[in-house]
């Protein structure tokens, strides 16, 4: 990216002033690298962001196909962009979670913030030591838009492999309402019973959503 009418373009600005000096539009333009015939890469970046309401969260949650469908983007640019966004997510996890002690449901909710905006249900098993420090985690299932599947066998296989003393099971409600369903309550009871048999404590089952969370432990249901 060269100078445009005397103005420093994104790559030059990053070299001179660092990445924090760039707007989101400019950062996305660097990832896209090139525009298309008749459209500068900064214009393409603007079009792409506008397609997802200017929200990095919506852009991050979009599928490759949805991103690639923006005129001028295509699959190659979409793949590069998704990879960059995923690296950002993983960096956030490293910065915010390690080390981490999950001794309250509020901390669990903050720990799993990336789950609350997903459009599909996922189930995460967080493995803990005796002091409630995180020693591992695993995403078990990706459900449909309105249900997920949690099987005690899979939950405690993860716990045993991590040599965990306890586990916290977390899943999201894409609807935005964290209120547990009848199925959620049933699986919580099954997980509790299985944990008692195996000697691995079910520390909590937490449902997270955009409007908050529900903790079975906090509500006295565990």
UniProtKB/Swiss-Prot annotation:
GO terms for biological process: proteolysis. A motif (JAMM motif) lies at residues 171-184. Signal peptide: none annotated. The keyword Ribonucleoprotein does not apply. The keyword Metal-binding applies. Keywords: Hydrolase, Metal-binding, Metalloprotease, Protease, Zinc. InterPro entries: MPN, RadC_JAB, RuvA_2-like, UPF0758, UPF0758_CS, UPF0758_N. GO terms for molecular function: metal ion binding; metallopeptidase activity. It holds the Pfam family UPF0758_N. SUPFAM superfamilies: JAB1/MPN domain (SSF102712), RuvA domain 2-like (SSF47781). Residues 101-222 form the MPN domain. Zn(2+) binds at residues 171, 173, 184. Belongs to the UPF0758 family. This is UPF0758 protein TM_1557. It comes from Thermotoga maritima (strain ATCC 43589 / DSM 3109 / JCM 10099 / NBRC 100826 / MSB8). The lineage of its organism: Bacteria, Thermotogati, Thermotogota, Thermotogae, Thermotogales.
